[in-house]
């Protein structure tokens, strides 16, 4: 085989990340070994799965392992696996570049964070853990051979911005990463990573639950290599090391009784599984028995991942069959709105070579999914009832995702509605549930009032709020983008209809108030009988009706929709998604007691044909549109008319 040697540059983002690692100020440098072991474990998982496919590589799972070789004299540490390996192109693609969304966000947060736990969390979340080796290395060498291919690839870099890659004739199947260690420096927390006790400590802390045996081998023994059945060389320990006890326990934590697992073990397993080095907010350990048996160990994180709302974000949990790993991110086991849940599901009755296509149709998987969802929602409900602080944390981090379930999961809609926690005008510092809102409703109130918008400040200052504030009615303040959608889909909660205060007619007066003000109302209808149709004609391109308002107390006008109209914010959202949305005509409501509206009526009575009067009508509509956060059709014209009217008033 011809040897091809190239010196290539890292992608720009990779160079920046390398510089952060090479000149690292992060306190927890031990994580480099955790990341190398995690990568090795992934490679072994992929090889075992590939072996299940027809014409896949022949593999004896009992021989699959991870080795750690420490050479004290050479000051090197090698992490070796006999997994799937990589081709030359894969090495360039996976190590020479960072082909991931959110890279800029990762770099920014790493620069901001000097805390070891925080930085290791970010490194793990973004899947760029290989680069962490440069926190402890002067140079890193990688040798890899792809399963089923002859030859291999050697990669080497000192982290200065370039790397050397070459094709080699002889490479065992799998990957070996050799870290040429920097000198010890206790002040910089650079420890002796060739020390056996230090290696054992790191493996026990971070990688105890790795499913493959991790063995520590001496440098001379590691040079003795076995051979595969097919004759290709395979990395492995020498005979004198074959019986060594693994450094990790490899315990299937989910298979043990819940009473026998302590919090520290749950935390360690969660950290291994998720690369989130804070503890989980909630642990859900369950077992299903009967016609279809399974165990599940699920975790609700303490904080949302950075990519929770990105299209290519991780979702789903790990699937095992009889303790054998099948796949990561099994989306078929949990709905999308629970994508933040991490964990493991181990079934007893599925085939080891089950495919995603079969999973989608398998009734047993659908049964497990239903049970998992109900258990997760019940656990969140228990937090809501018994631990308000942790529940508020959960809702702050994942509430927006959970509310997506109101659109996706009709079977559990009522359960999710019971969990919904939103801001309201009742208490600016404490969100409320719908159940709590109902308990505070006024005696004559039959509807749950809400208003959607971009922010709490915008909603609180909306003209639509004026009458509700004046009469002491509580209004839900909904600011998540998903709120615009689910309130349209959900008709009621606990028999109480949900009512947007920006739609339809609003009448908050009691029967006695209506009787006492009936004469006044009738007089106002007569006074404005000429102005209202005139305004409707002037603004016919934008409004379908002009009427007197019962919801305004201080603003001159506002725009409202009919009961089943789409909100302006929802229209804007659909347009941003590329949908063609016509601009529906709205209803313009006037405050008959406002000085501007009263002046407009008087001016109309004096000269209904005045051009200036028509301009004022246009300005009035524009003001109402801006007050609800809408967009003017012609901002330049609006500004010019406003300037002219202001000049006339001076």
Curated annotation (Swiss-Prot):
CDD domains reported in the protein's UniProt record: HATPase_Hsp90-like
Highest rank taxon of the organism: Bacteria
Chain intervals for the UniProt region annotation (A): 1-356
InterPro entries to which the protein is assigned, alphabetical: HATPase_C_sf, Heat_shock_protein_90_CS, HSP90_C, Hsp90_fam, Hsp90_N, Ribosomal_Su5_D2-typ_SF
Region (C): 573-650
Gene Ontology CC terms, in alphabetical order: cytoplasm
Pfam family for this entry, one: HATPase_c_3
Region (B), start-end ranges: 357-572
GO molecular function, one term: ATP hydrolysis activity
Main location: cytoplasm
Record keyword ATP-binding present: yes
Gene3D superfamilies according to UniProt: 3.30.230.80, 3.40.50.11260, Heat shock protein 90, C-terminal domain, Histidine kinase-like ATPase, C-terminal domain
Alphabetical UniProt keywords: ATP-binding, Chaperone, Cytoplasm, Nucleotide-binding, Stress response
Region ranges (Disordered): 222-245
NCBIfam families in UniProt: PRK05218.1
Family indicated by similarity: Belongs to the heat shock protein 90 family.
UniProt subunit comment: Homodimer.
Protein name in the entry: Chaperone protein HtpG
Gene name per UniProt: htpG
């Amino acid at each position: 085989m011809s040897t091809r040697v190239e010196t290539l540059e890292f992608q720009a983002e990779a160079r920046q990340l390398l510089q952060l690692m090479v000149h690292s100020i992060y306190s927890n440098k031990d994580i480099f070994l955790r990341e190398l072991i995690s990568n090795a474990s992934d490679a072994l998982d992929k090889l075992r799965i590939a072996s299940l496919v027809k014409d896949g590589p022949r593999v004896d799972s009992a021989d699959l392992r991870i080795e750690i070789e420490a050479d004290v004299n050479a000051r090197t540490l090698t992490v070796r696996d006999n997994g799937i390996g990589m081709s030359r192109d894969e090495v360039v693609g996976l190590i020479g570049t960072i082909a991931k969304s959110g890279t800029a966000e990762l770099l920014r947060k790493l620069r901001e964070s000097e805390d070891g736990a925080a930085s290791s969390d970010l490194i793990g979340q973004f899947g760029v853990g290989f680069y962490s080796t440069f926190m402890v290395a002067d140079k890193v060498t990688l040798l890899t051979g792809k399963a089923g291919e002859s030859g291999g690839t050697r990669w080497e870099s000192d982290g200065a911005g370039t790397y050397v890659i070459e094709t080699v004739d002889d490479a065992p199947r799998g990957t070996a990463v050799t870290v040429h260690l920097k000198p010890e420096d206790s002040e910089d927390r650079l420890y002796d990573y060739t020390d056996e006790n230090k290696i054992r400590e790191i493996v026990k802390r971070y990688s105890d639950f790795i499913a493959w045996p991790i063995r520590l081998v001496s440098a001379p023994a590691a040079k003795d290599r076995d051979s595969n059945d097919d004759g290709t060389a395979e990395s492995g320990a020498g005979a004198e090391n074959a019986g060594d006890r693994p450094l990790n326990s490899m315990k299937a934590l989910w298979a043990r009784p819940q009473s026998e697992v302590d919090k520290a073990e749950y935390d360690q397993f969660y950290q291994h599984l998720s690369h989130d080095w804070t503890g989980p907010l909630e642990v859900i350990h369950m077992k299903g028995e009967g016609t279809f048996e399974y165990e599940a160990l699920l975790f609700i994180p303490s904080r949302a991942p950075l990519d929770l709302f990105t299209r290519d974000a991780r979702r789903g949990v790990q699937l095992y069959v009889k303790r054998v790993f099948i796949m990561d991110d099994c989306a078929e086991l949990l709905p999308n709105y629970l994508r933040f849940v991490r964990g493991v599901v181990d079934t007893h009755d599925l085939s080891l070579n089950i495919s995603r296509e079969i999973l989608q149709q398998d009734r047993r998987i659908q049964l497990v999914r239903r049970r998992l969802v109900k258990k997760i929602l019940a656990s969140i409900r228990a937090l809501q009832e018994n631990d308000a602080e942790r529940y508020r944390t959960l809702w702050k981090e994942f509430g927006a995702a959970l509310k997506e379930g109101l659109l996706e999961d009709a079977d559990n809609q009522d359960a999710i509605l019971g969990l919904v926690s939103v801001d309201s005008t009742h208490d600016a510092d404490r969100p409320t549930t719908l159940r709590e809102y109902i308990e505070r409703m006024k005696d004559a109130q039959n509807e749950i009032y809400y208003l959607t918008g971009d922010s709490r400040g915008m909603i609180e200052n909306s003209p639509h709020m004026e009458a509700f504030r004046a009469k002491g009615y509580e209004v839900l303040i909904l600011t998540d983008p998903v709120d615009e959608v689910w309130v349209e889909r959900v008709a009621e909660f606990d028999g109480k209809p949900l009512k947007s205060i920006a739609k339809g007619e609003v009448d908050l007066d009691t029967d006695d108030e209506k009787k006492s003000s009936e004469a006044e109302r009738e007089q106002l209808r007569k006074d404005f009988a000429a102005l209202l149709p005139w305004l409707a004609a002037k603004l016919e391109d934008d409004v379908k009706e002009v009427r007197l308002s019962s919801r305004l107390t201080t603003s001159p006008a506002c725009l409202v929709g009919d009961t089943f109209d789409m909100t302006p914010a929802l229209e804007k959202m659909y347009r941003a998604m590329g949908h063609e949305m016509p601009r529906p005509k709205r209803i313009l409501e006037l405050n008959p007691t406002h000085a501007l509206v009263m002046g407009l009526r008087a001016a109309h009575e004096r000269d209904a044909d005045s051009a200036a009067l028509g301009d004022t009508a246009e300005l009035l509509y524009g003001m109402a549109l801006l007050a609800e956060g809408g967009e003017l059709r012609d901002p330049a014209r609006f500004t010019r008319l406003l300037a002219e009217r202001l000049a006339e008033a001076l």
